[in-house]
Amino acid sequence: LVSWTFAESHKYVWDKKNEKVSIQWGENLVFLNLKEWNKGKASIKNEEIKDKKLDVLRGKAYAMFCNDSYWFIAPYKVFDNGVSRKIVKIENQKDALLVTYSSGGVTPGDSYLWVLDEKYTPLYFKMWVKILPIGGIKGTWENWITTKTMAKVATTHKIGPITNIISDVNTGSDLSEIGLPNSYFDIIK
């Protein structure tokens, strides 16, 4: 279990084992059951949404989760289904890892070239993604922390003039360890 805030505006609680996630931004709160889409719930200003806007909010929350969780834990996603990995040579005959996402998420086909340090920790990446008109844009992995559960995550990513900060990182083996009641996801059982 993990909770985090992305770019000071998207707050997440993710139970990866049970495939449930909550996403809060502004006055919106969405609970997604990643195994059973129709069980997802959404509210605006604490008022449950049940009309056509429910699917719009679930879709937006899912897209945000795919993007923001990538930036949060990308090194842990390289062995997901639909991901290919290849060692390639870059300048000075240094090895780099080319990671391509052929399926899953909301932007299949995106590729990232990861440049690693001597301990194989990502230093920076170059990306070729569908949402950007030019390829090879460089971004960084900075300010690494080790969580209570011993996961290592970079909390700063600089991409051109944009800096994305990941904050409020909390991990645990159950919801109570991250400060939430164990019934937190019962709304989408």
Label every PLM stretch briefly.
Residues 1-6, 63-71, 115-132:
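Short, basic/low-complexity N-terminal boundary segments at the transition from targeting/disordered tails
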Residues 2, 10-12, 21, 83-86, ...:
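Residue-level detector of beta-strand structural context in well-folded domains
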Residues 41-108, 132-135, 187-189:
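Flexible, processing/modification-adjacent segments and terminal tails
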Residues 1-47:
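N-terminal mature ectodomain segment of secretory-pathway/periplasmic proteins
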Residues 15-17, 87-95, 147-149:
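Short, ordered beta-strand-loop transition motifs
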Residues 94-183:
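Gly/Pro-enriched, hydrophobic low-complexity segments
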Residues 6-8, 17, 26, 79-81, ...:
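Residues that act as N-cap/strand-start positions at coil-to-secondary-structure junctions
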Residues 29-37, 44-66, 106, 157-189:
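Catalytic loop of the DD-peptidase/beta-lactamase superfamily, centered on the K-T-G motif
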